[in-house]
Amino acid sequence: MQLFVRAQKLHTLEVTGQETVAQIKAHVASLEGIAPEDQVVLLAGAPLEDEATLGQCGVEALTTLEVAGRMLGG
């Protein structure tokens, strides 16, 4: 299935739904150079856990995931 990932640019990924959020972060890192530990992946504004698969998160075909950077400081 196709999945859209919006980071600094919009990317189209071909996925099965069995990929983990951590794998998506690694892919975004290779595309945009943002370290996975500095990424927050959001679905409808809610952050997704790294260990969860896309299917477990409710990601369906043609869904858009947002990738935000972590805020520095505390």
Swiss-Prot record:
<comment type="similarity">
    <text>Belongs to the ubiquitin family.</text>
</comment>
<protein>
    <recommendedName>
        <fullName>Ubiquitin-like protein FUBI</fullName>
    </recommendedName>
</protein>
<dbReference type="InterPro" id="IPR019954">
    <property type="entry name" value="Ubiquitin_CS"/>
</dbReference>
<dbReference type="InterPro" id="IPR019956">
    <property type="entry name" value="Ubiquitin_dom"/>
</dbReference>
<dbReference type="Pfam" id="PF00240">
    <property type="entry name" value="ubiquitin"/>
</dbReference>
<dbReference type="InterPro" id="IPR039415">
    <property type="entry name" value="FUBI"/>
</dbReference>
<dbReference type="InterPro" id="IPR029071">
    <property type="entry name" value="Ubiquitin-like_domsf"/>
</dbReference>
<dbReference type="InterPro" id="IPR000626">
    <property type="entry name" value="Ubiquitin-like_dom"/>
</dbReference>
